[in-house]
Amino acid sequence: MALSTILTAAAMPVAGLFAFAQQSSAFFDQIPVLGSMLNSPVGTYDAQAAQMDGRIQARDLLSSHFGPVGWPHQSFDYVIVGGGTAGLAMAKRLSEEEGNSVALIEAGGFYEMDAGNATEVPMYLFNYFFDNGYMKNPLFDWYQYTEPQEGLHNREMFYMQGKTLGGSTARGAMLYHRGSKGAYQKWADEVGDDSYTWEKWLPHFQRGIKFSGPNTNPRPANATAVNDDKAWSASGGPVHVAYPYLTNAISSWVDKALDSFGFSNVQGFSNGVLLGKSYITHTINPFTRRRETASSSYLREALVESNNLNIYIRTLAKKVLFDENKKANAVEVQTDGFKWKIEAKKEVILSAGVMRSPQLLMVSGIGPKETLEKLDIPVLSDRPGVGQNMQDTIILGPTNPIRVESHSQLLGGKDTLPRSIDDYNNHRTGLLTNPGQDFFAFEKHAEEGPGSLSKETAADIDANFPADWPTYSFIALDDTFVPQFNGKNYFSMSAALMTTFSRGYVSINSTDTLDNPIVDPKWLSDPRDQEMAVAAFRRCRQFTQHEILQDVIDGEELLPGKKYQTDDEVLGYIAETSDAYYAGVGTAAMGKKDDPKAVLDSKARVLGVQGLRVVDASSFPFAIDGQPMGTVYALAEKIAADIIAGN
């Protein structure tokens, strides 16, 4: 096999979402050296980067923070289940308090050891992003599949979920932004708590983030990024947020074209204003130019600053245990087949994610009575909302060939990937520093033309979402939805739906958390979402047909091609090729105490029991307008502050 072919497999940029799964297995049979390519040395650092490389260190003995596994009568003030986005933030903040003892239970391990550079190099994001049938790494992902999705031609979708320290911050697209001010006002209204308004959220957003502005690294003159300094704090941290070192060439063309459609320039999508266009920030360390995760930030600092945190890796939570007063007092766990328990003196906090937090609630006796009784689980608290209200969206759009360099070259280009690896190893420059999507725009639905909706659907959106909440998110995706393997340059003008009405669920058919839960997002099950999907696609196509983008587009639309014109044809293409946003929320939703569908109160406490909270994306009452990672970090900061304050 040619070296260029092996290198191409090693990089696995945007893998075309679905068609990659159809590639011949013979291709993969010849890649025994793939691991060495992925784990090739990552080159020299400058002096500043060398000091910030995220190595695992501790205040005292590093080993004091791990285990001991299986010993009886281990007891901590707080026991946190899940070492992901929220779990590690909670663990750091609670362990900072003198006298607090904290245990963190994580089913996975360290992603650096389990997945190599696939989790470190920004553009290697897509190495295991999709299940193509030939390359899997169950060490750091749960390999969860959905029920057949009727709205997506009955596809059973792989749903990426991190099983590692860092959780999905080690798996996702690194996109960092915040919701609109109206979204957080809606949150405050739905849970009956004014501490969820934008002004009250902002300090929690600021506390966790160490922002490096666009001048940290040089940017092209035609790729100006503007930020609202009031959105950030100079004392924030530990999570690095910055712009990728490389600016995608196509992004400046999209930026210029959208001027003609009336898009205003906004200040980075983190000051509560989304409607408009901007380059977008990522959780990338601007000095090492590597992925930043909850593990490389919160955990690394906690290990150095505190002796109050114990971590149990490769340890699966089986269920939460309660005393006679329905107070959570322990977590039953399993390590390599051995069952034991970790006791909690104050609280148990579930941060296992949108699928596994509701699963743990149900196997512990908290959930819909009918579901629990079918599995002979004693009902501790009948909460019909557990596992319900799942919300996520999809990403879709047309693909065009272009005359400027794009990440699609990495698939099949004989020279592009070796050059990019050399650039990254020796200079921390080039295509591998950017995960392939750095320019976004948000828009309300139009009143007429492409992007417009029926009066009925538009009225439903207006009635259910705030005025500053966008209908669509547009993304200049520097690659293809279906891989081409020819080394040519393509880009996909993509869209995600922000005002969806489809609602799915998470359930169980087993009492064993070793078994994956049942997950049914029900994408495009609501006709209004189907209408929005077609309208968003047509709007993307309208952008690419503008004269400015025609100057850089090299020929006719590649996918789906101009023969797809009717609504049914476009919807069919979307159903076959669109992918998950991997941003599910809402399956253990906050709400008012008198709401029978609420699972949590506004302090993230599970209703009907004591000493148990859920803090992660499942806690959201609804999907906010955009990527949830920034809000999950802030929610963890907020609830940790509540706990420390005695709430």
From Swiss-Prot:
Its cofactor is FAD. SUPFAM superfamilies: FAD-linked reductases, C-terminal domain, FAD/NAD(P)-binding domain. Disruption phenotype: Impairs the production of dothistromin. Pathway: Mycotoxin biosynthesis. Glycans are attached at N117, N222, N509. Induction: Expression is positively regulated by the dothistromin-specific transcription factors aflR and aflJ. Dothistromin biosynthetic proteins are co-regulated, showing a high level of expression at ealy exponential phase with a subsequent decline in older cultures. Its EC number is 4.2.1.143, 4.2.1.142. It is an enzyme of class 4 (lyase). GO terms for cellular component: cytosol. It comes from the Eukaryota. It is found in: Cytoplasm, Cytosol. GO terms for biological process: secondary metabolite biosynthetic process. FAD binds at T85, A86, E106, A107, G172, A173, M174, L175, A617, P628, M629. Keywords: Cytoplasm, FAD, Flavoprotein, Glycoprotein, Lyase, Signal. One of its GO terms (molecular function) is oxidoreductase activity, acting on CH-OH group of donors. Residues 1-26 form the signal peptide. Versicolorin B synthase; part of the fragmented gene cluster that mediates the biosynthesis of dothistromin (DOTH), a polyketide toxin very similar in structure to the aflatoxin precursor, versicolorin B. The first step of the pathway is the conversion of acetate to norsolorinic acid (NOR) and requires the fatty acid synthase subunits hexA and hexB, as well as the polyketide synthase pksA. PksA combines a hexanoyl starter unit and 7 malonyl-CoA extender units to synthesize the precursor NOR. Belongs to the GMC oxidoreductase family. PANTHER family: DEHYDROGENASE PKFF-RELATED (PTHR11552:SF138), GLUCOSE-METHANOL-CHOLINE GMC OXIDOREDUCTASE (PTHR11552). This is Versicolorin B synthase.
